[in-house]
Amino acid sequence: EFQSIQNRIADMKVYLEAARLAVYRVAASKDSGTALNPIAAAVNKMYLGDRGFEMSSEAVDLFGGYGYIHDYPVERIMRDAKLGQLGGGTSDIMRMIVARFMMR
């Protein structure tokens, strides 16, 4: 029942698990004393920021009108996720960093 909504939630779960693995990779690198290279940092920042906002926006859509009301946490989560895209360099800046590295 409501297969379309189930599919959207499943996609969100896939993005969440990929993001979790990226964070674990950075944490393991830090724990081992290995420096994370700047390109990996830019890739993670870009991916996590974009997917975080995409998933939170999707959640707002799934909540319908309630997704925009302050009574539900999904509205705040989307605002916070937008800051994740912008803080520390926008996704466009991260793309430029990655592209410059790839063009070497």
Residue ranges and their predicted role:
Residues E1-R104:
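Alpha-helical interface subdomain recognition
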